[in-house]
């Protein structure tokens, strides 16, 4: 029983540490951006993000910070992480 508890504690510690690692950022432009998006969004399909889901609130502060920018602004003009790319899937 103590061994199982020790293993569970060790696994949870490893998982917590892995989530604390900073994500690597890169710039993605042109074909490289298109291919990366195709690879990341393969199962979901690549759909353009829409602000329609936020339109009913009517308050600008409820919209996400990046709502007015596109993927090129976020990932070509500046480096971005895979999490940012995935938010566009």
Curated annotation (Swiss-Prot):
Disulfide bonds: 29-76, 41-89, 75-80
Chief localisation class: secreted
The entry's keywords: Cleavage on pair of basic residues, Disulfide bond, Hormone, Pyrrolidone carboxylic acid, Secreted, Signal
Compartments where located: Secreted
Residues modified as Pyrrolidone carboxylic acid: 20
Coiled coil (residue ranges): none
InterPro entries linked: Bombyxin (IPR017097), Bombyxin_A (IPR030680), Insulin-like (IPR016179), Insulin-like_sf (IPR036438), Insulin_CS (IPR022353), Insulin_family (IPR022352)
Gene3D superfamilies named in the record: Insulin-like
Any one Gene Ontology molecular-function term assigned to this protein's record: growth factor activity
Secreted is among the record's keywords: yes
The keyword Metal-binding is assigned to this record: no
CDD domains documented for this protein: IlGF_insulin_bombyxin_like (cd04366)
Signal peptide as annotated in the record: 1-19
Domain of life of the native organism: Eukaryota
GO CC term, one of those recorded: extracellular space
Propeptide span(s): 50-68
Note: Silk worm has two kinds of PTTH: 4K-PTTH and 22K-PTTH; there are many forms of 4K-PTTH.
Function: Brain peptide responsible for activation of prothoracic glands to produce ecdysone in insects.
Family: Belongs to the insulin family.
Self-association and partners: Heterodimer of a B chain and an A chain linked by two disulfide bonds.
PANTHER family assigned: INSULIN-LIKE PEPTIDE 1-RELATED, INSULIN-LIKE PEPTIDE 2-RELATED
Protein name listed in UniProt: Bombyxin A-2
